[in-house]
């Protein structure tokens, strides 16, 4: 109860800070928006049964933007004092005087703003007990070591707890807030046999502490993952079907988010520039953005400009439905904001209601990719090339681990080549998706 009271007091302080900033801004004869984000948390790190680190953190920022007619000035600070706020407003207005006039800048249209924040069940405080957190982290390691003698070392076990408070206001009368919690636990272990040594990790992430994977199960899963990579082999260069496992498939669709972001669209720096309302995925595939998903990791009632978020289709029957727009790039494109200032919310990628095992059988022979490396994706032309590790699949069953491969292609072709998506949805990211089977891709090995 003490923690809840402290958070409520901090929230009240931040709301009053925004109110005071807006009150002071009435003297500068300009449109103003104010945003405060404050995160309070604690992290415990254990390695080989020894506490390596206990870290308390409190990080936040006050962001002020003024629009002096069509000229913009922005400032930020960690100092929330009245004296500093006055100084920030002076600096922001001075910056705007030296900024070039831009017809597309300005506050959102009032009809798009959020005046009543929706309750999304994001706040689940936990009275953090350091001793219990240490015990939970040690238990993850202990269960990993005990599960198999081939587990020989640990790279650490973590437990994190964070609370974030967001407050937004502007000179059009908006003053809204919401708070959220986020918990995570993580374990990374090293396995060794006569011929090789491999590492792997596992983790969970949730809004409620009780929804995290149990420490002993986390340790066992991590150990199993590390052991499964022992004896990794190299393979020949080939063209092959592949499956992106559900733990990494969100990355595959994150490139879509980049390609349809408003900045890339109005700058014509995306390969999808001419594809709005065009088919770019199989006709059975939908992607819904739901910012109002209860306890969702990407849920929020309003975006970073105070625009109310809404449920919408990104992809419907394989067809691209919308760009991802903030107010500025929306005006550039003569469109309306989609409430995506600050990024995407919860993307729910449809699947074909088949199990992961059925997906393996459907592929029959090919590569299961479980980890990707590098940043070799060019949104301008859609070219894709990334390092990967995973498993060779034979007759619909995982046969042996593989490493040191590169997969390459073009995103447009890769999206069109999606054969099926299984129902093993990973909910630890803003993009929730099952494992994805592609009919064919270039694989470079030996």
From Swiss-Prot:
It is found in: Cytoplasm. GO terms for biological process: proteolysis. Its main location: cytoplasm. It is an enzyme of class 3 (hydrolase). One of its GO terms (molecular function) is metallopeptidase activity. Belongs to the peptidase U62 family. Keywords: Cytoplasm, Hydrolase, Metalloprotease, Protease. This is Metalloprotease PmbA homolog. InterPro entries: Metalloprtase-TldD/E_C (IPR045569), Metalloprtase-TldD/E_cen_dom (IPR045570), Metalloprtase-TldD/E_N (IPR002510), PmbA (IPR047657), TldD/PmbA_N (IPR035068), TldD/PmbA_sf (IPR036059). The keyword Membrane does not apply. One of its GO terms (cellular component) is cytosol. It comes from Buchnera aphidicola subsp. Acyrthosiphon pisum (strain APS). Probable metalloprotease. SUPFAM superfamilies: Putative modulator of DNA gyrase, PmbA/TldD. Its EC number is 3.4.-.-. It holds the Pfam family PmbA_TldD_2nd.
